[in-house]
Amino acid sequence: MTHARAIVCLLAAALPGVHAQQPSQPTRAFHDLGHAILRELIEVNTTGSVGNTTTAAQQLASRFEDAGFAAADVQVVGPTGKNRNLVVRYRGTGAHKPVLLLAHLDVVEAKRADWTYDPFVLTEKDGYFYGRGTQDQKGGAATLVTTLLRLKAEKWVPDRDLILALTAGEEGGMPYNGVEWLLKEKRALIDAEYAINVDAGGGELDKGKHTMFDVQAAEKVFHSVSLTATNSGGHSSLPRRDNAIYALAGALDRLGRFDFPVKPSEVVKAYFGKAAAVATPAVAADMRRVANGSADAATYARLSKVPMYNAQLRTTCVATMLEGGHAPNALPQMARAKVNCRMLPGEDPANVERTIVRVINDTSVHLAPIDTAVPSPVVPLRTDLLAAVDASTRAIWGPMPIVPTMETGATDGIYLRNAGVPVYGFSGLFIATDDVRAHGRDERILIKSYDDALDFTYDLLKRVSAPPARAR
């Protein structure tokens, strides 16, 4: 008997039958399986430099095959041998179109010297799991894998197929993006009515209290430009007024003091309306004004002092990199800055570029686009999915606001949205607002939070894959 089959058999024995009216109570066997899968994922290096997502995908594929999934429903695919994707189909009755469950296997780089513990060993310490990817985003991936194995052990028959896609290339540093490749080359494997992406949204902890649960329904558009000032230069002992570094510095100063216009979308209005429930009275009043359309310039000015609120309300452009000069005793012949914009959905990149040129107001500083902006359409809020999320959060943690959000960063959901598949981003992991360590040193999650996320994912997937009478 394989190790994977032993765990699944233990799990099956510990869980009540599928015909019970209530979902099975959380069991130690279920959580132990989840811990084992998380450990397995963390301890496979999947960075872009020396890592390998294929190894992680193949190990998980063996677990699914040992659990009774048909070989045709467990596929490790991709254009390269080193960094492939895992796609698993949990077959249902076909009464409804499938739901896609999305996570990525790759992680950002981590240097052992920077960490207290080895980033590629799952370390348990003081109630936390430490390891690269615990927050971003192997923790979320492990909850999906564990839950599908649990449902299989219980012989759960969903009313739609549940498709799991664990992909490569989300963090960059790999020759391709897994979701983009699957849509182009293997669309039938992942085509779905909608997708749940566990790389966005989720719960917020404030001083140990579960305050609210975010559901991502939109994300901003990534677009970078360069600003370059040039000059004939000369000897530094003979300074001139037309200095390339000064010209660029002045342009960046003017850009830094500029705010793009406020344009709250329906998702953003819904976000402020829901988030008001957990804000201080003064902030809550401003949030409600945004939600009901009565906000004035003073309201927006107050909210914009908070970076998160500011980023929800408008397009932002910020200098992120600088280079210039060629010798310490020479006048600079060139100074260049990279400016990263996060545009509101629907914003025209050309219009943003024209605005930057107008704001910097210096013909000696030239703008050039660095990349081609990929549109990110806003998806309609599904009342059935929001109701399921609300019911599942209540079952695990009690009532709290379910808050539609716009992701200020970027996720793989952008490829699916552009392909016509609505994407909603959330996971069951609650992370303290002052302990966000994704991409940082000593990345960690609370073990209790991870166990709760396992229970939440199980409860939610039963709700979205069965009529209400069977879901609970």
Task: List PLM regions with ranges.
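Bacterial N-terminal signal peptides
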Residues: 5-16
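Boundary at the C-terminal end of the N-terminal hydrophobic targeting segment
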Residues: 18-20
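Acidic/His- and Gly-rich active-site-bordering loop/insert found
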Residues: 22-132, 151-160, 339
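Acidic/histidine-rich, surface-exposed loop or edge segments in extracytoplasmic proteins
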Residues: 35-46, 125, 228-231, 364, ...
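An extended, acidic, His-containing surface patch that forms the Zn2+-binding/catalytic region
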Residues: 94-96, 203-205, 261-329, 333-334, ...
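Acidic/histidine-rich catalytic neighborhood of metal-dependent amide-processing enzymes
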Residues: 128-129, 135-214
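A short core secondary-structure module
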Residues: 180-181, 232, 237-261
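Short amphipathic alpha-helices in soluble, non-transmembrane regions
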Residues: 242, 352-360
